[in-house]
Structures are given as structure tokens and as C-alpha cells.
Amino acid sequence: MPRSFLVKKHFNSAKKPNYGELDNHTVIISPFLYERYPVSVLPQPDIYSSVAYSPITVWTGLLHPPLPSDLSPLSGYPSSLGRVSPPPQSDTSSKDHSGSESPISDEEERLQTKLSDSHAIEAEKFQCSLCSKTYSTFSGLAKHKQLHCDAQSRKSFSCKYCEKEYVSLGALKMHIRTHTLPCVCKICGKAFSRPWLLQGHIRTHTGEKPFSCPHCNRAFADRSNLRAHLQTHSDVKKYQCKNCSKTFSRMSLLHKHEESGCCVAH
């Protein structure tokens, strides 16, 4: 063990610190060492100015903010509240000093003008070349040309086999099939304009009658013939003979009745 630890040293009592002076000494603690809480200050109207101040900011000691050189608070504020943040600058771009809105800048005005022009161009993008009407969608323009445009309605598609005219090209193509008859029966050579008409005709060769009447035992090769037959079972018979007041379910039955010689009831 070193000898210095074994030597007893005597301390001078005159150099003993005065603990009473330390107790009476005022310790100033910076307000920036406390937690950060916004403290609202209600200024008196006769002391403070009308400039609005933001809430006072108090920093915690964990963040270690740099202490300002001047710790003295602003005039009119209590020193225990700490340093007051500077007042926010007023926004002069949107409002003037009187509180009314200022005119829009040239750049914003040009931007609004450009946006309005683009919306106008987009809204009137599709224009009819015949009557100068504008539409926002192409489908609306196409429907206008086909149905509502007077200039387009006068334009027609003529059939090269007869004198019939049609507004649309699709309707003309469907009509031309009645002249060309592209659906031909392989059994008898009879031609039809529609495939379903040919299918119903082929059943006359095969004897197939898939459509049966639910009220009687009759069956038909075509659905349209079944619908006509069902009218005979209906209670409503809207075709009436003018001579004998007899009613029929179909016009063809009324014609047969008139051709056979109507017996007028006396």
C-alpha cells in the first residue's frame, strides 16, 4: 500500500465552506429546461400591441436546445414564462392590411385561364361536321349523326336491287340478304335470308317438331307457329267478323271464315 494513504492529514477549520451562504444563494433555473407546453397569454389591451403572438414554447432538458444570449423576456411579459417566439409574419399575398382579399397574381390568372380553356376544348371536342353541334363523347356524336341530325337523315343508302333506301348501312346489308338469299337448303335447294328460317325449313324434311302445345297434342317445327296456335286456346279473341260478330284468335282464321261465306244470323 502506498505511504500516502497511511499519512494522517489535518484540515484547517478556517477553510471550511460556509454552507449557510450556499443555502441563501438564489439559484436561477432556465425555463428552457422544462417540458414543452403551449402557454396561452392573455395580453391587456392597454399594454400590449395588437400583433398576434404564437403560444410560448418551453423546451425540455432532454433536447438540449442552444441557450440564447439574451435571456431577458420581452417587455410586458412575465419573466417566468421564458422566451417568447417571434410573431408570425402576416400573409400579404392573399389579403392586404385592410383584411380584404388582394387581386390574383398574373401567374395564377394565367393558370386558371389555361385550365378553363382546356376544359372547354375537352367539352367541345367532338363536333358534328354537318350541323356544327358539339358533344363531349364520341358515342353521343355518333348517336346524333344516326338519329337526330337532319342533314344525316337526308343522307340514305339505296339498295342496288330495288328502290328501297335506309338510313344506316347495317340495315341496308340486312335488306340485301332478302335478295341474295345466302342460306340454301341442301335437301331441296330452297334458299332463305336468315339462318333460323333455314333451320325451321329443314325440320319439315326431317319431321322434327320440338315445339309442343301444352293444351293439346299438337306439335310444331317452328316456335312462331306454336305462338300462333296458342292464341286459339286464349279466351281473348280480338278478331271479329263484321257480319256475324263471330270472333277469332288469329287474322288468318278470320280471313278463312270470310272466304268460306259468312252466314249472317237472322
Swiss-Prot record:
SUPFAM superfamilies: beta-beta-alpha zinc fingers. It is found in: Nucleus. Its main location: nucleus. First expressed on the lateral side of stage 12 embryos. At stage 14, strongly expressed in the lateral neural folds. At stage 16, expressed in pre-migratory neural crest cells. At stage 18, expression is dispersed over the neural plate in a pattern surrounding the rhombomeres. At stage 22, expressed in neural crest derivatives, including the branchial arches and the tissues surrounding the eyes and forebrain. After stage 17, expression is weak in the lateral plate mesoderm, increasing at stage 26, but was down-regulated in the pronephros region at stage 26. Keywords: Developmental protein, DNA-binding, Metal-binding, Nucleus, Repeat, Repressor, Transcription, Transcription regulation, Zinc, Zinc-finger. Induction: By a combination of noggin and fgf2/bfgf in ectoderm. By wnt signaling. Residues 75-115 are annotated as: Disordered. Residues 1-20 are annotated as: SNAG domain. A zinc finger (C2H2-type) spans 126-148, 157-179, 183-205, 211-233, 239-262. One of its GO terms (molecular function) is RNA polymerase II cis-regulatory region sequence-specific DNA binding. GO terms for cellular component: nucleus. InterPro entries: Snail/Krueppel_Znf, Znf_C2H2_sf, Znf_C2H2_type. GO terms for biological process: neural crest cell fate specification; neural crest cell migration; neural crest formation; regulation of DNA-templated transcription. It comes from the Eukaryota. Pfam families: zf-C2H2. Interacts (via SNAG domain) with limd1 (via LIM domains), wtip (via LIM domains) and ajuba (via LIM domains). Interacts with elp3. Probable transcriptional repressor. Acts downstream of snai1 in the specification of the neural crest and neural crest migration. Belongs to the snail C2H2-type zinc-finger protein family. This is Zinc finger protein SNAI2. It comes from Xenopus laevis (African clawed frog). The lineage of its organism: Eukaryota, Metazoa, Chordata, Craniata, Vertebrata. The gene is snai2.
